[in-house]
From Swiss-Prot:
Belongs to the transcriptional regulatory Rex family. Residues 16-55 bind DNA. HAMAP family: Rex. One of its GO terms (biological process) is negative regulation of DNA-templated transcription. GO terms for cellular component: cytoplasm. This is Redox-sensing transcriptional repressor Rex. Modulates transcription in response to changes in cellular NADH/NAD(+) redox state. Keywords: Cytoplasm, DNA-binding, NAD, Repressor, Transcription, Transcription regulation.
C-alpha cells in the first residue's frame, strides 16, 4: 500500500482531511460521516469516498469513519511520525515572515536553516533559525541532510538557485517565485504564485458571485 501511487489531486487533499481530523480529535469526536467531512472541508462526499477507497476499507457503512483510527492512518501516510527539517532560501520580506511563522508547532515540519546573499545576514540567527551565507548553501544542505527547500528569492535568481539545490541533492522545492523552474524528474516542485492566486480570486469575484451573474 505504501508504494501505491494515487492521483495527484487526491494526494493534495490528504493534508486537508488530516487537519480536520485533528480538529475533530481535539473536540473529542469519535466518528464522522463522509457527509459531515464534506461540509467541513468543502469537498463533495463522493470525492472523499473515492479518495479513501484508494487505501482500502477505512470506514463502515452506516457508521462512518472512526476519527482516531483514520487520524492514525493518515498520520502514517503523510509521514507525520518524524520531524522533517526544511530550509529557506531568500530572507526577504516573505522569507522573514515564513521564518517567524515556522509552522507554529502545528505539524512535523520545521525550518531549521536559512540562506541569503546579504552579508549582514550571514551567520546570524532570526526567529531562532541560523542564517548562512549563500556560498555555504550546498555544503550545509548536504551536511544537514535537508531534502526540502522553500524558495523565496527574486525571480531573476530562481533558476540559478534551483540548479544549486539540485546539486545539493534536494528532492522537493516549494517555489514562491514567478519562475517555472527546470529541474530533473526526480525533483518535485510545488509552485505558489501569490499574484496569480489574487488575480484568480478577483476574477472569480467579478464573474462567479451572485451579484456578477445577471
Amino acid at each position: 500500500m505504501a508504494n501505491k501511487k494515487i492521483p495527484r489531486a487526491t494526494a493534495k487533499r490528504l493534508p486537508i482531511y488530516f487537519r480536520y481530523l485533528n480538529v475533530l480529535k481535539d473536540a473529542n469526536k469519535q466518528r464522522v460521516s463522509s457527509t459531515e467531512l464534506s461540509e467541513a472541508v468543502q469537498v463533495d462526499s463522493a470525492t472523499i469516498r473515492r479518495d479513501f477507497s484508494y487505501f482500502g476499507e477505512l470506514g463502515k457503512r452506516g457508521y462512518g469513519y472512526d476519527v482516531e483510527s483514520l487520524l492514525k492512518f493518515f498520520k502514517g501516510i503523510l509521514h507525520q511520525d518524524s520531524l522533517v527539517s526544511v530550509a529557506l532560501v531568500g530572507v526577504g520580506s516573505l522569507g522573514s515572515a515564513l521564518l517567524n511563522f515556522n509552522f507554529h508547532q502545528d505539524t512535523n515540519l520545521r525550518i531549521s536553516a536559512a540562506f541569503d546573499t546579504k552579508p549582514e545576514y550571514a551567520n546570524t540567527v532570526k526567529s531562532g533559525i541560523p542564517i548562512y551565507p549563500s556560498e555555504d548553501m550546498v555544503k550545509q544542505l548536504k551536511e544537514q541532510q535537508i531534502d526540502v527547500v522553500i524558495l523565496t528569492v527574486p525571480g531573476i535568481k530562481a533558476q540559478h538557485v534551483a540548479d544549486q539545490l539540485v546539486e545539493a541533492g534536494v528532492k522537493g522545492i516549494l517555489n514562491f517565485t514567478p519562475v517555472r523552474l527546470s529541474v530533473p524528474k526526480n525533483v518535485q516542485v510545488q509552485n505558489i504564485d501569490l499574484t496569480n492566486e489574487l488575480q484568480t480570486l478577483i476574477y472569480f469575484i467579478k464573474n462567479y458571485t451572485e451579484d456578477s451573474i445577471k
